[in-house]
């Protein structure tokens, strides 16, 4: 009887030890998971904040009223982010057109950029982009490039440069951002990117249709030729 009691006590202690080890392991795993979640959130926040910081060379707003954040612009320079500031700050000028092509420019190109922080919703950002396009006279140009930027807001200026040069400046371009993280970290924003671009294209198409109706019978073409371009996740 004593032997059985001792054996039972030892069995209970072993069982309790295993339970304790299991609980300890569970707590440790939960701690690791929680720690990794916090670390990931901190990393994403820091990455997004870095994308908001402007490069030293683009901290001063452009001097042209034909680009976003320039004189008279409705876009706050603080709302375009690093990539947006680069995009509007490197617009081709009439002098560039003359230097590269040898031809006289028709006009200085228009560039519109609206970043993620410029509005609380897709509709607000698209509405702001449309207001900028109207303000700058973008719908009076022969070409309008609609660009879907990458996850960071990066809008590739190279294809836009080409259109600006070939049209001798008689063009406009627009991009609306939907995030601040690299595309491989923005896969959860695919629907937002698609919704943003769809809303922008539909708004521009409606404006062009309206202008075409108003100019019908006037003997002139009342809308620009639309060109679409997407970068990475865009």
Feature map (PLM): residue ranges:
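Soluble catalytic regions of membrane-associated enzymes that act on cell-envelope
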Residues: 65-234
